[in-house]
Amino acid sequence: MANSKYRADFIYRNLQIQQNVIGESFRHGVKKLLFLGSTCIYPRDAEQPMREDALLTSPLEYTNEPYAIAKIAGLKMCESFNLQYGTNYIAVMPTNLYGPNDNFDLERSHVLPAMIRKIHLGKCLNEGDWQGVCRDLDARPVEGIDGHCSQEEILLVLARYGISSDKVELWGTGKPLREFLWSEEMADASVYIMEHVDFKDTYSQGDTDIRNC
């Protein structure tokens, strides 16, 4: 939901961050850089399981488009610096991550923490645990509604996110496949890549079109 609602923020801030980090890494002679992208860079209708060479072959998912374009730009920036200046900037595309200190903000969170929080709030409502609902909203208000607001206001805002005492609505058709990875395992993989993988290992020698993906 956040990708679609805050489209300008997503593309503007991500492009700014990437340009600053990659550009300053080059300016200061950083020997190796790991750029983390996103699986949303691949086309909406890409054949499953997705192949890396599906990138830029057809339209992106519209709701993720600004974020995806920013991530593609970062990947191509790393690739272009490598080809022009001989840098060693590696781009990897993690799947959906979850783990400690995750973001449970219903307006901005990713799919798994959003599902967990929705189910938690739905369970509290179903069991009549109003204190549990209020504690949750005091910790993370939704659209400015916290646990001190009226019951009517709270129920109304939760209903907008598909949360009620008798059901929890998870958005989507139910057809897409999702893959999740524990964040600490991604951290281990990132360390391994930095220690054992270089840009030259990401393509076959003799390739005329070199891709950093």
Where are the predicted features?
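Short catalytic/ligand-binding loop motif for oxyanion handling, primarily in non-cytosolic enzymes
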Residues: 1-2, 42-44, 99-100
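NAD(P)H-binding glycine-rich loop region in Rossmannoid oxidoreductase-like domains
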Residues: 1-14
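Short-chain dehydrogenase/reductase
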Residues: 11, 15, 54, 59, ...
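Conserved active-site region of classical short-chain dehydrogenase/reductase
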Residues: 15, 19-23, 76, 184-187, ...
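Conserved Rossmann-fold NAD(P)-dependent oxidoreductase catalytic core, especially the SDR/UDP-sugar
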Residues: 16-65, 90, 103
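Active-site Tyr-X1-5-Lys
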Residues: 20-23, 62-95, 111-133
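Active-site pre-Tyr helix/loop in NAD(P)-dependent dehydrogenases
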Residues: 38-39, 53-55, 75, 94-101, ...
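Alpha-helical substrate-binding/gating segment
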Residues: 83, 97, 113-170, 178-212
